């Protein structure tokens, strides 16, 4: 496992808040390394990480309930600065002798706090005697502060909206500074890590690149590494970073399942072979995948079929590479990101409903008995893009919209055929071309065309047509967890629809999807 030591870091103890990852994002944006660990293993994480400061997250539990989560005593014994947020405020105060009660007026949504006393927590942007908007989400509240604490700010239903023991560097907020609805929340978190904890902004992708190259060389030695290349940003950045570290000890395998966008496979193969000179095995498996998918209309069966075939094809190619006389690869590279790591050790540890199966190479390590090389496992998606820029990847590649592993198979509801895929590729290319011409590509999180399993009557010239319906989808989002449809003007939609109908044989009607997530998902399948 490829990991870096971080002497100057922040530990975030997760008590189950749905927005804990946003705390980490804000801290990273401030140039400071941090890790999230669930409260169940926080003591072990604290001892291992040796952080310079700790943040207690919010959470759904009530501090007044028997057996509700607590922070490890070792954190208090260490005397490092602490910031408690919402539930984090309540458990910190409870554990230090304060009182928390339920049944008072709750606050959910926007609230205004009144600053009663100056504090380094908001030095430079909030002033004593003034009010500022924040985002609250609490039912319980602190009714008695621990010894040594004083009120810094209040709100209508939170007498201790901010409370602190500045001598011990303990700070608490009843509101959530990590969410965008608290306009100055990012500055507050930055002040905590810089002015209170005293850390510098030394978490950069340049430093990460140099240290990760050293760690990869240390882990791999003279061994060979295989990388399953999808053509997406994550696996591409991982491959280029590993190649920079160990050169031709890396071999990439690109399995072309025949479900990519127009010209995409050629672009990926050309970039890796010609521009980066990375050893690449290009497997044209379109006939295999499309043959197995013939007549399959259930989206879950599609996803699982694609995942199974990918593993089978990759294993076969790995066996060929192992027999080339240069030694069998002992390492498997994956583009695992930090959110994947967090979710694998979730706060609750309980089951969750599977909305859609995720197509990835998760089944490969156990089956192939290989050690993992995961150079991105400490990074969020935006940091991966920043690392890609640091490595010199073109912006046109780094800024590409997300594309699902099963490819166009899930943008073609119902049974797929080569003819349908060709129609969809052309429509999708025209749609994205119009988006780029309008200067909207970087504004939109994700945009794509969907070919519906529905045919409608149309008229072209003097002839009746009976062709497919194409749906256009475009959403704005921060992280893909929630999304809103993009509000195009009608002139744009008219241009895109006209081009698609005129230039793509097989489509005679175009519609626009105005569903947000939730209740819908971004992809149609």
UniProtKB/Swiss-Prot annotation:
Pathway recorded for this protein: Purine metabolism; GMP biosynthesis; GMP from XMP (L-Gln route): step 1/1
A GO MF term: ATP binding
Family matches, as CDD domains: GATase1_GMP_Synthase (cd01742), GMP_synthase_C (cd01997)
Domain of life: Bacteria
Entry binding sites for ATP: 230-236
Pfam families: GATase, GMP_synt_C, tRNA_Me_trans
PROSITE patterns membership: GATASE_TYPE_1, GMPS_ATP_PPASE
A cellular component annotation (GO) from this entry: cytosol
Active-site residues, as the UniProt record annotates them: 86, 176, 178
Record keyword Heme present: no
This enzyme's EC code(s): 6.3.5.2
Keywords: ATP-binding, Glutamine amidotransferase, GMP biosynthesis, Ligase, Nucleotide-binding, Purine biosynthesis
Domain GMPS ATP-PPase: 203-400
Glutamine amidotransferase type-1 domain sequence ranges: 9-202
The reaction(s) this protein catalyses: XMP + L-glutamine + ATP + H2O = GMP + L-glutamate + AMP + diphosphate + 2 H(+)
Subunit structure of this chain's protein: Homodimer.
Function: Catalyzes the synthesis of GMP from XMP.
Protein name (database record): GMP synthase [glutamine-hydrolyzing]
Organism: Agrobacterium fabrum (strain C58 / ATCC 33970)
Gene coding for it: guaA
